[in-house]
């Protein structure tokens, strides 16, 4: 029953977002994507994709569920789903083994499970509006555990690609947890395997608040790529931030703070390969 209610709420948001996007005017995400026929390879331009930009929507394949939203109404997952979907299609060979961390009722797995072998590592505790109980894992394998717990259900060096969407920011921030999570990902990645994580961050007037796992990954893996420069991000006119409309319809009831006080939610993308390979 709870899963059905969540599905209903998601569909309701999709309908309302599309309606508001039409009222506000401008092109939808789907139209922006269709306008650009020659997509930019993400991996070859990973520095450009280090954080969410308005111009990215033209370069990404937009899942149908998000196609009628606009940059003025989209939520973080609309951007993050599109980035991960495009990256996988551009860079991961069909049949590859892929692990999503904290996928819940994963939209990416639903779209691509016929082409790739998917696992979803999720404790199912409802974090970030996710499911709280087991579900029918059609087309993939569900493992109910945490990243960093070294689950025996996930074999060493067995995954070609690991990704997460709005998950890393929910992990505990203590040094031990961060170290264990990175070590577990390294354990799970096959030689030459790679990670791409889309992480929610908060841009304040004087600083960037982001989970410490990103900084640790940058300091310990020479292949890690992202941009955590407050100076660069805060002055980028192309920066895409969570829209005013979306903040007040999705998050205000949780934060109980005005957007100006809370800070601007943005997406940071971090990529790396196993063991510096």
Where in the sequence are the language-model features?
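Conserved beta-strand signature within the Rossmann-like core of class I S-adenosyl-L-methionine
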Residues: 192-200
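Class I SAM-dependent methyltransferase SAM/SAH-binding core
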Residues: 99, 103-150
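A short acidic, Gly/Pro-enriched loop at the edge of an enzyme's catalytic core
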Residues: 150-162
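A short glycine-rich, Lys/Arg-flanked "PGG" loop and its adjoining helix->strand segment in the class I
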Residues: 176-191
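Class I SAM-dependent methyltransferase Rossmann-like catalytic core
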Residues: 36-91
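A short SAM/SAH-binding and catalytic strip from SAM-dependent methyltransferases
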Residues: 160-175
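Helix-to-beta-strand junctions that scaffold the AdoMet/dcAdoMet cofactor pocket
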Residues: 93, 171-172, 189-191
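Conserved Class I S-adenosyl-L-methionine
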Residues: 206-239
């Amino acid at each position: 029953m709870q899963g059905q209610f969540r599905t209903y709420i998601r569909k309701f948001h999709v309908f309302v977002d599309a309606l508001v996007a039409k009222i506000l005017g401008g092109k939808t995400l789907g139209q922006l994507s269709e306008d650009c026929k020659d997509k930019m390879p993400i991996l070859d331009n990973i520095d450009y994709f280090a954080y969410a930009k308005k111009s990215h929507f033209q370069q990404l394949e937009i899942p149908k569920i998000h196609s009628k939203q606009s940059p003025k109404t989209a939520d973080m997952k609309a951007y993050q789903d599109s980035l991960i979907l495009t990256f996988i299609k551009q860079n991961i060979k069909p049949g590859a083994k892929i692990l999503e961390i904290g996928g819940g009722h994963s939209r990416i797995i639903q779209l691509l499970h016929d082409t790739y072998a998917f696992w979803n590592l999720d404790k199912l505790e409802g974090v970030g509006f996710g499911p709280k109980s087991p579900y029918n894992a059609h087309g993939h394998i569900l493992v109910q555990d945490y990243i960093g717990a070294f689950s025996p259900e996930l074999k060493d060096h067995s995954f070609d690609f690991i990704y997460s969407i709005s998950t890393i920011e929910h992990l505990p921030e203590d040094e031990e947890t961060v170290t264990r999570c990175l070590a577990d990902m390294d354990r799970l990645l096959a030689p030459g395997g790679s990670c791409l994580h889309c992480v929610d961050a908060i841009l304040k007037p004087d600083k960037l608040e982001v989970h410490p796992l990103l900084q640790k990954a940058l300091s310990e893996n020479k292949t890690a790529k992202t941009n955590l420069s407050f100076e660069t991000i805060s002055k980028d006119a192309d920066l895409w931030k969570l829209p005013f409309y979306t903040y007040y319809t999705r998050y205000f009831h949780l934060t109980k703070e005005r957007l100006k006080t809370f800070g601007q939610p943005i997406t940071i993308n971090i990529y790396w390969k196993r063991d510096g390979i």
